A protein has these predicted regions:
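Short S/T/G/P-rich N-terminal loop/turn motif that feeds into the first structured element of a domain
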Residues: 1-60, 86-90, 113-148
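Serine-centered coil/turn micro-motif
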Residues: 36, 101-102
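Short, glycine- and small/hydrophobic-rich beta-strand elements in well-ordered beta-sheets
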Residues: 56-77, 104-116
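Short gly/ser-rich anion-binding loops that grip negatively charged ligand groups
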Residues: 71, 84-85
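Short, charge-rich binding segments
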Residues: 72-73, 90, 103-105, 138-140
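Conserved, mostly hydrophobic/aromatic
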Residues: 81
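Short amphipathic alpha-helices in soluble, non-transmembrane regions
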Residues: 93-101
């Protein structure tokens, strides 16, 4: 991880580096369960599910986290983890913990995308809905589908 001046200042003040007003980081991570795990004993698959659920619970405590099944829609992935945070370091820390966990070798990650939302320079602050557009999501929505 490279360090820029903003990150250095955040370490001095103890305040986490954040995207700034009206910006959020959005991470789309597609995973596939390894064939060896899929063909292995049911107990091993159940243990993988429990450990992954525990990691996802920790992610949800720190940032907006949703999972979506891609079974039947993509041949190269099984599920998507969608994370939204004001703090990019938080996303990186979570992914580092996943890669350091015992389940890392059981998952393949064929696709991984990072984006950043940004308030439009054309938005009208006098418009009734303007304050609600400052963040991507703050309602913790539970839509069944997410199109990437």
């Amino acid at each position: 991880m490279s360090e820029n001046a903003g990150q250095a200042r955040s370490r001095q003040t103890g305040v986490p580096a954040q995207a700034g007003w009206g910006k959020q980081f959005v991470k789309f991570s597609f995973y596939r369960v390894a064939d060896a795990v899929r063909q292995g004993p049911q107990e091993a698959r159940l243990e993988l599910g429990k450990r992954l659920a525990s990691l996802l619970d920790r992610s949800a405590e720190r940032m907006l986290t949703r999972t979506y099944s891609t079974v039947g829609t993509r041949a190269d992935t099984d599920f998507l983890i969608w994370q939204v945070s004001d703090d990019l370091d938080e996303i990186q820390r979570w992914h580092a913990s996943l890669l350091a966990s015992p389940i890392a070798g059981s998952l393949e990650r064929p696709h991984s995308y990072l984006s950043m939302t940004m308030r439009s320079m054309y938005s009208n602050p006098l418009h009734d809905g303007a304050p609600k557009r400052d963040t991507l999501r703050d309602d913790g929505g539970t839509n069944d589908y997410l199109f990437v």
